[in-house]
A protein has these predicted regions:
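Walker A/P-loop NTP-binding active-site region of P-loop NTPases
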Residues: 4-69, 117
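C-terminal lobe/tail of nucleotide-utilizing enzymes
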Residues: 163-225
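Conserved C-terminal guanine-recognition region of P-loop GTPase G domains, centered on the G4
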Residues: 152-166
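Glycine-rich phosphate-binding loop used to anchor ATP phosphates in small-molecule kinases
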Residues: 111-129
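Conserved nucleotide-binding/hydrolysis micro-motifs of P-loop NTPases
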Residues: 41-43, 94-95, 147-149, 176-181, ...
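P-loop/Walker-type NTP enzyme "switch/lid" segment
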Residues: 39-113, 211-221
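Inter-motif core of Ras-like GTPase G domains
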Residues: 127-148
């Protein structure tokens, strides 16, 4: 059974989807079979980022409602990324079709039997979309930009994840620039950010325009260079 990781952040624009796609591509490049699940009903984006948006017929809501078999709602991302072991399960087009947490708990473990990793891209905030996305997760990556509001929200997310039994959490500081960090003068150093969120740091990602605008291509092309 594959490991289920939810990618989350309390604040919109922190880069959850970028990290989700980048992580999925990296794992797939390393030979892992990966399923990306877009958890942002009404505002899905992974389909466009992975070049399958024109192919979509079914999504995760069609599986839980019995409209199709899971295989029909899971799309290969090989044509765009060149990775034949990377797949996407899209979110519903409408927010009202957000999957109930209990149904996520039933569906995701079944799907995870066929993959080494399942990565769930969580919507921003801590509403019903968040509760749905984290319901079946084994662990979480909390994405934060190095600004006070996002960092404060990350601490709140940490607490909510712990309340739901997800204690294996790691912090990713995204869009980091030493120059901007020094100019802001909000924090003495990165250790201060770690202390404020209460989450162990796993990565600091640079403020890279190529990575932010096209993470799939950035990751794949980097491996070939």
């Amino acid at each position: 059974m594959g490991l289920v990781t939810v990618i989350t952040s309390g604040k919109g624009g922190a880069g959850k989807s970028t990290v989700s796609v980048g992580l999925g591509c990296t794992l797939a490049k390393n030979g892992k079979r990966v399923l990306l699940i877009d958890g942002d009903a009404g505002l899905r984006s992974l389909d466009a980022m992975l070049g399958v948006d024109k192919e979509l017929v079914f999504d995760i809501s069609d599986i839980v409602n019995g409209n199709c078999e899971p295989i029909k709602a899971i799309y290969s991302c090989e044509e765009y990324t060149g990775l034949n072991n990377l797949f996407l399960l899209p979110a519903p087009a409408l927010e009202k079709h957000t999957i109930h947490p209990d149904l996520m708990k039933q569906l995701v473990p079944i799907l995870s039997r066929y993959y080494d990793h399942v990565i769930i891209d969580c919507p921003a905030g801590i509403g019903k979309g968040f509760i749905s996305a984290v319901a079946a997760a084994d662990r979480a990556l909390v994405i934060s930009t190095p600004d006070p509001i996002c960092i404060r929200d990350s601490d709140k997310v940490r607490q909510l994840l712990e309340e739901r039994g997800i204690r294996q959490q790691r912090l990713v500081i995204n869009r980091f620039s030493f120059e901007s960090f020094r100019k802001m003068q909000h924090y003495q150093d990165i250790d201060t950010i770690i202390d404020e969120t209460g989450i162990r740091l796993i990565a600091v990602l640079p403020d890279d325009i190529h990575l932010q605008t096209n993470p799939a291509k950035a990751v794949v092309n980097h491996s070939r260079s």
